[in-house]
Amino acid sequence: EIMQGAYFLTFNFAGLYGEDMWLAGDGREPVADTYRLRCINIIVDHPYHYHAFIQEQLEKRADRYMQICIDQLHMAYMHRYFTQVKLGPFLPTAGTEMLCKPWGERTTDILFTGTYVCPSHFDVFINRNGEEYSQFYHSIIDEVLSDPHALLEDVARRRLTEEIPEATEDELRETLGHIQFLDYYIRFTLRGNVVAALADAGLKVHIIGAGWENLPCSHPENLILSPYASSEECLLALADAKLALNVLPCFHAGAHDRVFNTMLAGAVCVTDSNPYLDQILIDEENVI
């Protein structure tokens, strides 16, 4: 039995945007609204991916909605652009401890878990408004790719205000809610470059995730592909790996759970870093 005013804990707005399995009552409204549930939503990616969903929470259930972020700069973004949203505490990602095989019994040398989309897939969005816009978007992409400390939202905002000095805060927020394709372009460029470099150096890379057959590299024969696996299967694969790769997808003050899942599985996590990881990981103790 669902009690009025109980809590509804979810991730990435699941159950809050009208999926059939979460509808209730004669009016077929979300169960969170039928029972006036207090919603706690943990978003596990950057808030600029969710502007429309965040705005919907403010319109429908502002007094019953709390959002939790897994990166401290994601929280700063919310404070700047969605001041009306009640935020919970910063919630770092964690890992899951599965079977931890002895090193000598592990059969996978290098593992990566994650999907790949060729960056050219996003050219349709970059080029849709002509050459001038394309150059503008690529200037943002190039700056973020050249500086590992650059925040996409900050670079985009600065470039926008350089081009349109009279842009209002509302207009800037609206525009930042449409930069997902830039995020994906950068994310998959970095991810693809890392995997391609290893494959082209002659190393076998086991990959769990869709799309890697489209990776441009000179030695695709070094990619051992498994297109899909459940979360549990990914954890078991980590427990069978000696080394697992991680490329932080636009996290600068938080971390992807791949880092901690790998460590708890007893494998070596090879990852880029950020100030948050530099703070919580101790050199020569759990990181080198």
Regions found by a protein language model. Give the residues of each.
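Conserved aromatic-histidine-acidic binding/catalytic patches
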Residues: 66, 70, 182-186, 190, ...
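Catalytic binding pocket for nucleotide-activated donors in carbohydrate/polymer assembly enzymes
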Residues: 1, 57-61, 85, 185, ...
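Extended catalytic core of nucleotide-activated donor transferases of GT-like folds
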Residues: 1-83, 96-100, 226-227, 231-233, ...
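Catalytic core of nucleotide-activated saccharide and alditol-phosphate transferases
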Residues: 36-165
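Conserved catalytic-core segment of nucleotide-activated headgroup transferases in glycan assembly
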Residues: 104-239
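Hydrophobic/aromatic beta-strand patches that form the interior of the parallel beta-sheet core
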Residues: 9, 40, 66-68, 89-91, ...
